[in-house]
Amino acid sequence: NYQLHYDQPTAPSYDGWEKQALPVGNGEMGAKVFGLIGEERIQYNEKTLWSGGPQPDSTDYNGGNYQDRYKVLAEIRKALEEGNHQKAKQLAERNLVGPNNAQYGRYLSFGDIFMVFNNQKKGLENVTDYHRGLDISEAISTTSYTQDGTNFKRETFSSYPDDVTVTHLSKKGDKTLDFTLWNSLTEDLIANGDYSWEYSNYKQGAVTTDSNGILLKGTVKDNGLKFASYLGIKTDGQVTAQDGYLTVTGASYATLLLSAKTNFAQNPKTNYRKDIDLENTVKSIVEAAKAKDYETLKNNHIKDYQSLFNRVQLNLGGNKSSQTTKEALHTYNPEKGQKLEELFFQYGRYLLISSSRDRTDALPANLQGVWNAVDNPPWNSDYHLNVNLQMNYWPAYMNNLAETAKSMVNYIDDMRYYGRIAAKEYAGIESKEGQENGWLVHTQATPFGWTTPGWNYYWGWSPAANAWMMQNVYDYYKFTKDETYLKEKIYPMLKE
């Protein structure tokens, strides 16, 4: 088995979240597990939770494109022909750009699950046999330790077939599981580096609880996008609900089941919205999962995940090591580090499977896959079409994970709608209603068809980005030889 394993909990900072917390995901949802002692924090995401884009009832959204910018192209060409490069540069910098405003948006963190174990002491000094790990052969994160003669264990995974993120708590020994649990909007991480305290003002929501679980419902303030998550619980202990908190006492086990959704739809004609009863949807998903025992959920997850992961094996002849992953990285020797290289290779496959699966309205892996702890992520955690989205999917086909690329293909197909406006306004190529007559994208993109150039010409003008992305799209056919998919999906994109 391929394992990441550590002998210390995650630091409660952005740096800790980024470099230490362990990621799980089912393509749509992602979570980072901190692996704490006497408490736990699981920060989670849902890939369609974004600010920016059109309002639900918008009639004038156009993908950020300014009007009539193509009219300067002839003047730029003339300046270049005359050798007046400075004039051409100035014209391009003034005209071949897009807006820098809130409508661009950013990928938002969804929320945090917190647990405080009322009969446990915090801190590494109060436990023995501490282990925090991620088995990437089964896509399960584990935290375990022994305190006062009782071993406590937590397993977390994000299931694609059951569409829930699951955390199972168990114990061996005399002590029971007694803990307080809550589910909140994103809470701030301790500042470090470039990330000061992140007081999020992008979302508003409310929490309601009963003995079955915790419901979080809200909206993104600037665009009205609706979201909801439901955290259900299944346990042999006593559960009480009060003021947004659940308290569990006297349990030998507890299974937490999380579902998170938004009303985003990959459909520009509906302003990227769909009519959905979010509360009923997330509760129904959790209740369906709750009807299954933990081992069934776990086995469903492993079987689905391994149907993709087990297709490729890499044996470089390395020797198995008892080192923690941190120690292995610090002592890496290119002549003897084959086992770490195997792990690194398979970890990349794990991350793609976990952040990109085919599902209705699914988005591709963004700059951070599906994982984001703050509401001001680097580069908005968006979709960069000048190399980064291509890079996400370069390994997909040659590593026998073609299915993970379908969300990327659908996303690029969707970009054509506002890409036709970009072609009209920046290249003078007119597309009448419904006519497939050419499309254009640039460096940055969002789930909302943002096709205009970036707000700085130096990095934002990238008119070949769609052609480059289409290489990734066409690779799906080259590796699968699916002629029906080529004819119905890929070829119309290529032709236009």
Model region roles, listed by residue range:
Residues 462-496:
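Active-site neighborhood of glycoside hydrolase catalytic domains
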Residues 1-457, 475-477, 495:
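Aromatic-residue-lined binding/catalytic grooves and analogous aromatic/hydrophobic interfacial grooves
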